[in-house]
Structure formats: C-alpha cells, structure tokens
A protein has these predicted regions:
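Short acidic/glycine-rich loops and adjacent helix/strand connectors
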Residues: 1-320
Length: 320
C-alpha cells in the first residue's frame, strides 16, 4: 500500500511516501519550487512522489478543526483549514487521516530514533493548542505525559523577538541565533525576564509561564532600542533566556520520566547553539534531521502505523 504523509498550507511544506512500512521518499516543496520555505505543495514534488504510485491513504500532519478553533479563540478570526479542498487543487485523492500536530512531531522523532524507550520532548511555536509536549516512548507506543498551551510558548516568544529585531518570524530565527554571538547577553536579560516571563523558582509542575500573549508579536517592547548593537543585545538576551528555559524544561522532563534517552523535536530543536545543554541531563539524544513541520510529513504516517522504521539517512528527497 502506498501512503503519503503531507505537511503543507502552513510553512515548509513537505511530502513523504511510504510503500508499506518502508519510507521511500521525503522532500520539501522548496527543493522543487526553488521558493525558500515554500508553504505549499507544487506539481513537481507531487509528480515525483507519484513515481511510486498514487496513494491509497493520505496522512495530514495536524487536526484542521482544532487549528481553526484555536485561531478563532486567539482572535485571528475564522480561517478555513479544509484539507480535502486543498488537496483537490493538486488532483490528490484518497482516504484522508489526520493526527494532532505534536503527535506528528513526536512520532517522527521516536519511530526513527532506534530507541525502544525514550523521553520525547516537542518544543515549537504552536501546534493546534499546544507549544510544548512530553511523551514516553515504550516499544511501539507513545504516551502523552504533559503538554503546555500556546499562550506559554517559548517558540512563539523566540519568534516574536525575531520579529522585534526586524527579521521574519517563523523563518529567520536562525539569524537571531547567530546575532546573539555579537551581543552582550547581560545588558537586557533582566529586563526581558521581568517584562515577559513568570518563572517560579521551585514550581516544577509549571516549567514556564509568560506574562504576555505573544500571538501578535512584541514590537511594542523597548522602542528606544534601535541601533545595530541594541539589536545584537536583544538577540543575545533572547538566546540566553531561551537556554535558561530549555534547561528548566529538561529538568522538568526528568520529573516525568526515568529514561536516559531523549528525542528532541519541534522547530526549537533547530536551535543548535542551545542543543548541547541536553547532554547535561540525558545520555543519548536523537534529533531527527527535519525536526520541524517538514519532518511531520513522515510523522503523520508513523503516528498511525505506530511502527519503528529503519531510518535510511538524510538523502531521501530531491535528486541533486
């Protein structure tokens, strides 16, 4: 049976092809369209995927009605997330199955890790209603241990600070991470903590809580900081606080699991400057090479099949 996993209509669209339980192909739309971080599918990637045959089943990386409800509650207005209608634009038909956004992330990481048991940690900007989730992987099962709602999203906050520095949110966070090396992290860290984050020192039932709803960004914060060095210092403080919060989340994870294996997923797993911290708390670490929404094209399928696969390596996409 040919199964397609799809992550699209969001950012970094991707498509994965499974023949039975074997991953045959996974690629991002941008490789075919040449549009950086392309959010949509295109005829080229679809035609390439069809070389393995038309899909009998299609697996979508998130649950559309939950996403629409959250957008409505957050004041974004009603946004249509009709998957069937979206796929019809590309002449894609087949039985459509959906899964929750964070479960797709968790499945993409755990079932490719090679671990038979692991703590799975997903940190991103937002997925339906959640921004942080912790899972216990045991054998072929993934059990949700904890989740944190999007109003307390460390990923959304990092994206808001990316925008505050004049960069494109949900795309140019890597630039902010690089800018941090040029700034003084101590100049603004205290002010930033005071203005944004409530972090009770001993409350490990609540790893973090934000004072502001960052859905609409934080352009209002410290409008007096406009020079290039100011922006470097904002970046440095942001990165330093992110690393503080990551350590707090890792410490919190250890209260939920005794595993020494960690699977780290979600867009925040791309913060390579901070990832060294995970080895302070876990012995073995797997970060799937596409931990963001692109990798959820694979995870959408694995969340349903619930089977470990032989990870074929990173060269499973576009033929160079």
């Amino acid at each position: 049976m040919i199964r397609w996993g799809i992550s699209a209509n969001n950012h970094n669209a991707a498509l994965a092809v499974f023949d039975g339980d074997v991953l045959k192909f996974a690629g991002e739309s941008e490789r075919f369209s040449k549009i950086k971080n392309d959010s949509d599918l295109n005829s080229q990637i679809i035609d390439y995927a069809r070389s393995w045959g038309d899909p009998s089943e299609i697996y979508w990386f998130e649950t559309p009605y939950k996403k629409s409800l959250r957008q409505l509650i957050a004041g974004q207005g009603f946004v249509s997330n009709n998957v069937k209608k979206y796929l019809q634009k590309y002449n894609i038909s087949g039985k459509i199955k959906t899964t929750d956004h964070h479960r797709s992330h968790a499945a993409a990481g755990y079932y490719t890790s090679g671990y038979q048991e692991a703590c799975v940690l997903v940190i991103d900007a937002i997925g339906e209603f959640h921004s942080l989730s912790m899972w216990q992987g045991q054998g072929d099962q993934l059990e949700l241990l904890y989740n944190l709602d999007y109003r307390n999203s460390v990923g959304l906050w990092y994206s808001a600070m990316t925008q505050r520095c004049g960069l494109k949110p949900i795309e140019e966070e890597y630039i902010l991470m690089g800018m941090a090396a040029l700034g003084n992290p101590n100049r603004l860290t205290r002010d930033m903590l005071d203005d944004f984050i409530y972090m009770p020192i001993d409350d490990y039932n609540n790893p973090l809580q934000f004072k502001e709803n960052l859905h609409r960004g934080c352009q209002w914060w410290r409008p007096d900081l406009t020079s290039q060095q100011d922006l470097y210092d904002i970046a440095a403080a942001t990165q330093q606080i992110y690393e503080m919060l990551l350590e707090r989340i890792l410490q919190f994870a250890l209260t939920k699991t005794s595993s020494r294996n960690l699977v780290l997923m979600g867009g925040c797993a791309l913060n390579c400057a901070a990832n060294h911290l995970v080895y302070k708390y876990f012995q073995n670490v797997w970060i799937m090479p596409a931990p963001g929404d692109n990798g959820s094209a694979i995870g959408a399928v694995l969340a349903h099949t619930k089977k470990h696969i032989n990870w074929p390596g990173v060269y499973i996409g576009y033929d160079m």
